Amino acid sequence: MIVLVGYVLVGNILHLYLFPEQQVVKEAYPIVGDTMVNRFAKERYIVLKTDRETNGRYAEVELHLEPGGAIPEAHIHSNYDETFIVLQGELNLVIDGTELHLGPGEAHTVPKGTPHQPFNRGSREFVGIVRVNPPAQWALFITQFHGFLTEKQEPRNDFEFFLQAMLVSGFYGDTYLASPPISVQKALAFIVAPTARLLGYKSWKLENSLKWRR
């Protein structure tokens, strides 16, 4: 136990203070038109507006989900509300364990701090607008995380997903898994993040932004 505590403390001194992750460069921030494709989850995002276009009020993307597609994991945004607006097809939103069905012209806002996961259980492609208010680092986060999810020819396994989730939860500070409780995830991130860094994981990579640029 003493060895483990020492490893975690020394690891975090190295991770946070002596060798912190590089600050995100300007070129890595998403721009209008960036298009993220995650074939494993049958999803596609097109950036419509970032905080630069809205004077920091909100950010907006066009979301496409093929039949059977879904956002990879139920999750929580602690710093912003997220609104889903259906343009085409149908969207099923599981919100804190309750499933909501939305059709064309309908919209629903998920308040910050609420677990949620969108699905397309229909037989045709879903197309809709997703808007977050305030924008925080959401556009950068989805750009980078989808870059991570699609770096390999096969889907990320649960261990890889966990390591990255624990690392980025501390870096971005606004997106967490639906469970366990956020306080537990923050404690896990403190323990796990140094190991993730040691194994080569990064919260952001320039190439994970540029790959989506058209």
Where are the model-predicted features located?
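Structured binding elements
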Residues: F84
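Short amphipathic
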Residues: K49, E62-H64
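Jelly-roll (double-stranded beta-helix
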Residues: M1-A41, T50-Y58, G69-A74, Y80, ...
